[in-house]
A protein has these predicted regions:
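A glycine-rich, hydrophobic/aromatic-adjacent loop/helix-cap motif
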Residues: 2-214
Length: 214
């Protein structure tokens, strides 16, 4: 029996987008939608190199977040570059369930639990926990990348649950769609942008967004 290590990554932000992760980080794998218990998603990951605030996570016993489980060959140089403001922390598989009983995710999680010595799941935990501001803003094109990834999951209300389970929308969010500032954006159509804005309005967070340059 092979003892080769199998690595998995919890993608809870821009890695939700198959387009973004394949083009910018060479991660090619199917979507396996999951829910991770005991972690809270937050706009608190200050990116020093790109002058932005991205998504990060904190351990909070009562919290949960929806995400995608990604099978990766290794924590590659491309992935480390993408996640340079984070550390890779191992996650207990018992805290993860398949989103809306996704058969693919269920089967993969069962295999992971059956092989704890060779199958390891990691989550990227941000090194800095600082709220966004005008110098380190939240980019709309980053949000678009996350939400088109949610749309691709094929799970009802996955995008709405992403918004609901994300904290600290209130500061430093700018609309950069006319001049993309996020370094690893997904391809997003105008129709998808409209869907995203409708969803953000329904979830009562769109009011916090400012136009770039204002």
């Amino acid at each position: 029996m092979s003892t080769k290590q199998k690595h998995y990554l919890v993608g809870y932000g821009s890695l939700l987008s198959h387009d973004s992760r394949s083009r910018h980080s060479n991660i090619f794998c199917p979507n396996m939608p999951i829910v991770v218990n005991g972690w809270r998603r937050e706009w608190l990951a200050r990116g020093m190199a790109h002058l932005q605030t991205a998504l990060g996570v904190s351990q909070v016993a009562t919290a949960s977040l929806n995400a995608v489980l990604l099978r990766i060959e290794q924590i590659s140089p491309e992935l480390r570059d993408r996640e340079q403001d984070y550390q890779f922390i191992e996650v207990d598989p018992s805290t993860i369930v398949a989103a809306q009983e996704s058969e693919l995710a269920q089967a993969e999680l069962a295999n992971i639990r059956a092989n704890p010595d060779t199958c390891k799941i990691f989550i990227c935990v941000n090194l800095n926990k600082i709220q966004s501001n005008s110098q380190y803003p939240i980019y709309q094109t980053y949000i678009d990348t996350c939400l088109v990834g949610c749309f691709d999951m094929g799970v009802a209300n996955f995008a709405a649950e992403f918004i609901q389970s994300t904290h600290f929308w209130e500061h430093g969010w700018i609309n950069d769609r006319h001049n993309t500032l996020y370094a690893k954006p997904a391809m997003v159509t105008q129709q998808q942008q409209q869907q995203i804005d409708t969803l953000l309005k329904q979830q009562q967070v769109l009011e916090y967004r400012q136009e770039a340059g204002l």
